[in-house]
Amino acid sequence: MLRLSNAAVITTNAILALIGLAALSFSVYVYVQGPSQCQRFVQNPLIVTAALLFFISSLGLIAALYGSHIIITLYLFFLFLSILLLLVLSVFIFLVTNPTAGKALSGRGIGNVKTGDYQNWIGNHFLRGKNWEGITKCLSDSRVCKRFGPRDIDFDSKHLSNVQFGCCRPPVECGFESKNATWWTVPATATTAIIGDCKAWSNTQRQLCYACESCKIGVLKGIRKRWRILIVVNLLLILLVVFLYSCGCCVRKNNRVPWKRRFF
């Protein structure tokens, strides 16, 4: 059992350390080259995550190879902390991406201690002020609407993502006529005033409907969809960390066994 625990800890942490080092190297490379607007959103979280992954994995390798009681204890402490953080993150993501659960828990509490506004958290933090300006620049830089060429007249029949449907074309209720996928005009028979999102629409490729409320709704739906996937990823990570924690406990329990007997 001891040999299996050591082998599992060494193999898994070696792989994770390489992944962390590769991610850290990529982050530094992007920083040196000058990140785009989209890359700025993930650069700092990626650097921190990669550095922590490399650090904890290195601790695991040292703990399994040399059996230092202090290092093993420190390694287990960080693993336990990681489990707690992943659980909290998963619950938080569930609350902010599930309107029913978010609404049920928003503003609850005892006395002056109240929970936050989970129902509108994503909208309040991403769809306002400088954060939204950064997102619109990211959408423009990433050319999310460029998959449709000027001659692509079959625009409506394509499978559009929430972001593309809300940001790359005027709202359906505007009644605009499409000359092609990148150019829309007001019909000559239009009788209603051009207001709201219809007025915000621009045929300029760096503007389009990025200033529309429909674009914010599309981005909000896109964030919720991807964050729900992140919950599944977090749960898989929790299982992996629990496995490593169990193996680490076994290594710690038997760390007085002579070094050679751990592998032979």
From Swiss-Prot:
Pfam families, A to Z: Tetraspanin
Membrane topology: Multi-pass membrane protein
Extracellular side: 35-45, 97-228
Subcellular location(s) of the protein: Membrane
Family: Belongs to the tetraspanin (TM4SF) family.
Role noted for this protein: May be involved in the regulation of cell differentiation.
Protein name (record): Tetraspanin-12
Organismal lineage: Eukaryota, Viridiplantae, Streptophyta, Embryophyta, Tracheophyta
